[in-house]
From Swiss-Prot:
This is Putative HTH-type transcriptional regulatory protein Msed_1725. Keywords: DNA-binding, Transcription, Transcription regulation. Residues 125-180 form the HTH cro/C1-type domain. It comes from Metallosphaera sedula (strain ATCC 51363 / DSM 5348 / JCM 9185 / NBRC 15509 / TH2). Residues 136-155 bind DNA. HAMAP family: HTH_type_cro_C1 (MF_00584). GO terms for molecular function: DNA binding; DNA-binding transcription factor activity.
Length: 299
């Protein structure tokens, strides 16, 4: 993360009056989440990066966002104000683009390796075409594309070039133009961690209990889970005890921002007793198979 870019993002959040939480763990290692912010229309999970993030960091960002129902955003200086970068179900935005998204303004131009495209609203396109009595063949001739391409447009399987977008606006008005943020909620990716890790075992336990759940590697929580309106975060006691206080503080910030239940998994009864006095919900590592039962009892 670049300190200067972080300052710019924080300035935007303050200027726009956005409620946000800055995540400051881990401090020196790779980090998948920098900020969680509540925009005008949706919650954003934000990573600030000028370097290309690793696949693991990106997977973390996507899976965390998928489970808590938020939009993952990578803030980068690799794009212009009004152009998003679309890759692997994560939207890349400039600082200015993030400000627009936070305000709920449309961002409809995006760039991939395949070129620059305009996001369209497939349902509006289909409705407008039907209302104006255009067949797919009629519209394909007007736009200079195939009938199959029209079918793809109307089923949300393809967006359009700038040239085609201009023709669609002339025909149907700018209502047909979409917003890249509207379809930015990702799907869970499979866990790539060894299945014998504590976090993977916890995630599997919660998945078996009917939660959407994923282990998370590069932030203050190690497992994120949700079922209906209920969200659960699990933080595992770190190996380095010098990091414990910081990790728990940052995990608590995330839990408060998401209004979720936080469970701390510890290795010893003495640590459990110590943290229980501080008001944390505690489970020992030997008892993690009963985690879902503990959560159900708290409902």
């Amino acid at each position: 993360m670049i300190p200067g870019m972080l300052d710019e993002v924080l300035d935007v959040l303050e200027r726009e009056g956005i409620s946000y939480t800055l995540i400051e763990y881990p401090e020196k290692n790779r980090k998948s989440i920098d900020i969680i912010a509540r925009g005008k229309q949706r919650r954003f999970v934000i990573k600030i990066s000028n370097d290309r993030p690793s696949k693991e960091e990106t997977r973390d960002l996507k899976n965390f966002s998928a489970v808590v129902g938020s939009m993952p955003v990578m803030v980068t200086d690799d794009t212009e104000e009004d152009i998003a970068i679309g890759k692997d179900n994560v939207i890349g935005l400039s600082v200015e683009g993030l400000a627009k998204a936070l305000r709920g303004e449309k961002i409809f131009i995006y760039r991939t390796r395949g070129g620059i495209f305009i996001k369209i609203r497939s349902d509006v396109l289909r409705r407008k075409r039907t209302e104006m009595n255009y067949s797919m063949g009629d519209l394909s001739k007007i736009l200079g594309v195939t009938r199959k391409t029209i079918y793809d447009y109307e089923n949300g399987e393809s967006d359009v070039s700038i040239e085609v977008a201009e023709k669609l606006i002339d025909l149907f008005g700018d209502e047909v133009i979409g917003d890249v943020c509207d379809d930015a909620l990702p799907k869970l990716e499979p866990d790539s961690q060894p299945t014998d890790t504590i976090s993977s075992r916890i995630a599997k336990n919660l998945t078996d209990a009917g939660f959407a759940s994923a282990p998370i590697r590069f932030t203050a929580v190690d497992v994120v889970a949700s079922r209906g309106l209920k969200k659960v975060l699990v933080t595992v006691e770190p190996k380095n005890q010098d990091q414990l206080e910081k990790k728990l503080r940052e995990a608590s910030k995330i839990a408060n921002e998401l209004m979720s239940e936080l469970v701390i998994v510890v290795k010893s009864a003495s640590m459990a007793k110590r943290l229980d006095k501080d008001g944390f919900k505690i489970l020992t590592s030997e008892s993690i198979d009963s985690l879902s039962d503990e959560i159900n009892r708290s409902d």
